[in-house]
């Protein structure tokens, strides 16, 4: 019987398939992988694998540019950004481009420029991808040894890791430069309802920056997600950028220690599994960051957070009923607790009613009304500004709830709008992608470990029913 898998040790795990289908001269017989296994056929062809990666980058950048221009074409400056189904423009606005006081979009030309630059970049990447996939050398080791590699070469692998870390660090410093020198970034906490400003004094104190990592993730603590000022965010990027760059230099100059050589599996599929695990972790952290944090993801662009929409509703009705003569400090609700305001178990004055569970919300439209012991009753009576009323009324009807068929908002809220918050989309997509990346990590880690242990052939396939069936083609 014909052998249905490659006997070469360098292709450790195969999936059985119709071996007669050939694609570009790289069929299952010669590579051990079927056509649909995609880049697995290129594991030992560094030149072709480079082409696949560059072309993939071109597709990503093309999508970014095309979607960017699509959003610019559909953008209505008179409506809130978060009401228009935009997923890219909020990021550009957060970086301070085209934004005026209060988060108002005053100029869409920078967004157009961004889209065009991405399209041009995608053309360059696309050309490079096609060149390396079809024309360039199959392997780089002979012609361009600097770019060549062997997956087992531990020293070369950590050198490549170091180069990647330096590039990541440079990326972190791009945000730092934008915030410090090139026009600043949007600060939702700027007085009067947010504005673009330069961050002149980033936090560099290590106890402040790394203190976030030591915080509890629960309640009012909130781990790194609790960061609520741009000084700490930009200072954190200074620290992370520096750590990435110095770590990259370290990995380029050193060889892996003996314990690391023993602990890790050193194969292409193992590196894939490590990368998927890291991306999965990033996805889960980003999910929480987007959902709860309104400093890095300003509500003016992404819509309010869940707690923010809830507290905004309590605030809106407090303002209304206070105007109608209600004594908001003493009025009781149906449970005997305060209808508008109540005391938390530790004595702070917080909003009453169902929103009491969101007592730890911090939002720029609400913080000016706090005193040393929670909400300040005299400020609530005398100091509420029109912009605070307008913003809370807007946020009240734009809770980040909704389903994929775009029926959004609070089900019981008669003023809710038919929309899905970009905050919901961004948070949910990162959770779902993070989950699937984690499954991919388990899958590829299992295969890589099995190959390293030498039992990669799996169960005996001699009596598999599919072997007696007619080939698909």
Swiss-Prot record:
User: What is this protein identified as?
Assistant: Photosystem II CP43 reaction center protein
Taxonomic classification = Eukaryota, Viridiplantae, Streptophyta, Embryophyta, Tracheophyta
* Pfam families to which the protein is assigned, alphabetical: PSII (PF00421)
Which of the residues bear the PTM Phosphothreonine? 15
Note the subunit structure.
Answer: PSII is composed of 1 copy each of membrane proteins PsbA, PsbB, PsbC, PsbD, PsbE, PsbF, PsbH, PsbI, PsbJ, PsbK, PsbL, PsbM, PsbT, PsbX, PsbY, PsbZ, Psb30/Ycf12, at least 3 peripheral proteins of the oxygen-evolving complex and a large number of cofactors. It forms dimeric complexes.
Can you quote the record's cofactor note? Binds multiple chlorophylls and provides some of the ligands for the Ca-4Mn-5O cluster of the oxygen-evolving complex. It may also provide a ligand for a Cl- that is required for oxygen evolution. PSII binds additional chlorophylls, carotenoids and specific lipids.
Q: Which residues carry this modification: N-acetylthreonine?
A: 15
Name the NCBIfam families for this protein. Answer: psbC
| Record-level GO cellular component terms | chloroplast thylakoid membrane; photosystem II
**Entry's InterPro entries?**
PS_antenna-like, PS_II_antenna-like_sf, PSII_PsbC, PSII_PsbC_sf
UniProt function note: One of the components of the core complex of photosystem II (PSII). It binds chlorophyll and helps catalyze the primary light-induced photochemical processes of PSII. PSII is a light-driven water:plastoquinone oxidoreductase, using light energy to abstract electrons from H(2)O, generating O(2) and a proton gradient subsequently used for ATP formation.
Residue spans crossing the bilayer: 69-93, 134-155, 178-200, 255-275, 291-312, 447-471
What does the record say about its membrane topology? Multi-pass membrane protein
């Amino acid at each position: 019987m014909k052998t249905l898998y490659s006997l070469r040790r360098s292709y450790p795990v195969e999936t059985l398939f119709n071996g007669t289908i050939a694609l570009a001269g790289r069929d299952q017989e010669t590579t051990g992988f079927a056509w649909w296994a995609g880049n697995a056929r290129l594991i030992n062809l560094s030149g072709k694998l480079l082409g696949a990666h560059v072309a993939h980058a071109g597709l990503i950048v093309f999508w970014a540019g095309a979607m960017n221009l699509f959003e610019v074409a559909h953008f209505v400056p008179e409506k809130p950004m978060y009401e228009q189904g935009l997923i890219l423009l909020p990021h550009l606005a957060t970086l301070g481009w085209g934004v005026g006081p209060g988060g108002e979009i005053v100029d869409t030309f920078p967004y157009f420029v961004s889209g065009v630059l991405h399209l041009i970049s995608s053309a360059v990447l696309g050309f490079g991808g096609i060149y390396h996939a079809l024309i360039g050398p199959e392997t780089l080791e002979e012609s361009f040894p600097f770019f060549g590699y062997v997956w087992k070469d531990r020293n070369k692998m950590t050198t490549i890791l170091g180069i990647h870390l330096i590039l990541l660090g440079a990326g972190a410093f791009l945000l730092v430069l934008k915030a410090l020198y090139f026009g600043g970034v949007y600060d939702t906490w700027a007085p009067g309802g947010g504005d673009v400003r330069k961050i002149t004094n980033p936090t560099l104190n290590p106890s402040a920056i790394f203190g976030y990592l030591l915080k509890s993730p629960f309640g009012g603590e909130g781990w790194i997600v609790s960061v609520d000022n741009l000084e700490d965010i930009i200072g954190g990027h200074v620290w992370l950028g520096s750590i990435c760059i110095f770590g990259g230099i370290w990995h380029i100059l050193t060889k892996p220690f003996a314990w690391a050589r023993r602990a890790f599996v050193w194969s292409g599929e193992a590196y894939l599994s490590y990368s998927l695990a890291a991306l999965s972790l990033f996805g889960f952290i980003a999910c929480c960051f987007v959902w709860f944090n309104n400093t890095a993801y300003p509500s003016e662009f992404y819509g309010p957070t869940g707690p923010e929409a809830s507290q905004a509703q309590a605030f809106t009705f407090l303002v209304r009923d206070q105007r109608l003569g209600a004594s908001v400090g003493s009025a009781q609700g149906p449970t005997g607790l305060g209808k508008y305001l109540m005391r938390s178990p530790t004595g702070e004055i917080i909003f009453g009613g169902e929103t009491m569970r969101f007592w730890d919300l911090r939002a720029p439209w609400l913080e000016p009304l706090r005193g040393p012991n929670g909400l300040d009753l005299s400020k609530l009576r005398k100091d509420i500004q029109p912009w605070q009323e307008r913003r809370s009324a807007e946020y009240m009807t734009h809770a980040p709830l909704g389903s994929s068929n775009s029926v959004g908002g609070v089900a019981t809220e008669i003023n809710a709008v038919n929309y899905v918050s970009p905050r919901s989309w961004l948070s949910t997509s990162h959770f779902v992608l993070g989950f699937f990346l984690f499954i991919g990590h388990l899958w590829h880690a299992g295969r890589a470990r099995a190959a390293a242990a030498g039992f990669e052939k799996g169960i005996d396939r001699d009596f598999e029913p599919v072997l007696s069936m007619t080939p698909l083609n």
